[in-house]
Amino acid sequence: MRVDQTEYEEAEAYQQSLDLLRGCLSPAGFVASPVNVDNYARVWARDGVISGLAALASGDPALIAGMRQTLTTLALHQGPHGEIPSNVTVDGSEVSYGRLAGRVDALLWYVVGVCAYIRYSSDSGFKEFARVSVERVLFLAACWEYNNRGLVYTPISGNWADEYIQQGYVLSDQLLHRMALSSAGLVFNKTEWQEKATYLQQMLAVNYWPLASLSNDPLVYHPHAYRYQASEQGEIDHWLPAFSPGGYVIYFDGLAHALALLTGLGDDGQRQRAEAYVQALEQRIGSALLPAFWPVIEPGDPDWTMLQSNHLYGQIKNQPYTYHNGGLWPVLTGLHAVGLMRYGKRERARHLLAAINTANAQGSDGGQWEFSEFEHAQTHVPMGTKYLAWSAAAGVLANQAIWHGVPSWLL
């Protein structure tokens, strides 16, 4: 598969991506997709915010207005305890905070989006409108720590991987919490939020890359599991995705990897080791697109029965090499590329952008530019819902970071 692109090809893909984002605008903000299947034609917190971040990166006034409206829609439908909707119909008649479990990440993406928009626009009216909703979100997130020890606990089906089997102290959700606290502390001048973000960053660096030399560190959250992982399981090649009272899980998490880069988690050696793992995975898979999780769960594996049970619509989406079960996602790859640009890795980031653009340009029945949700990790055939706003957002965010730098309002 050809993955290099000329600047002309990058520019064409960028315009196609902007056009798709415009096509996902509604009176209520960005819908996940204009294709009305499985609730995709709704305003979703995580999809809408990521699309909105791309809007800010683009500088397009209509798209930026769409970001503001997305955040407004989410705020106006905030739940009684501070919950941010997972999704809302465009007319506001139906609001979901999650079906099988509530969505921890919806809260956190909302705060990240609110603060990015305010830092970009200096919109004082919106800042005052959003202030109370942000305070309620961060209070609720603290409640979801349960034991007041600093880490949010995510139930199964409680984040973007809603049909996967991830649960516990999930790294990607902790990183979003850190981003939310840091940016909200800056925007709303709350020293306690900034201090909590700093402490959380330190906790994450210790607890998600267990090292024998740190086994007695006071920041270790689960000493028995930590010591076992550090001493008995050998060296690891990437950030561990989650742990729970039952111990660590050790699969690769694409979103956690991307967010770890974006937030500057760890040291140079850890970043280089994790990137080496990702590049080796690319050679194995044959694509630079980042998988949601790896390795794949196969029928007969211990986790297969639980994976089969956790789905809502029709047949199981998480067949091997698809969806969250090893599927390759442009949106994760876009966040990965932005994270790489934080460290000036332009050549590698352009390689990822080419993979995103190539994936987005594919279509069925001879069509082009269908912006599919994900690709099959063996066949590289586009799969899932078409015309995904955040697949387009991936190309915009990566392109703008490569050619204009990582925006200060994001970090």
What spans do the regions from the language model cover?
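Hydrophobic core segments within long, regular secondary-structure runs in both alpha-
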Residues: A11-L18, R22, G52, I64-A75, ...
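Inter-helical turn/loop segments and adjacent helix faces that build the functional surface
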Residues: S58, Y117-F129, S183-E195, L265
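Alpha-helical support elements that line or immediately flank enzyme active sites
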Residues: D47-H77, Y120, A256-D267, T333-A349, ...
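Extended amphipathic alpha-helical segments enriched in small hydrophobics
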Residues: V170-L204, G327-G363
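Extended glycan-interaction surfaces of carbohydrate-active proteins
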Residues: R2-V43, Q69-A101, C143-G168, V206-L328, ...
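TPR repeat positional signature
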Residues: G48, G52, L107, V111-V114, ...
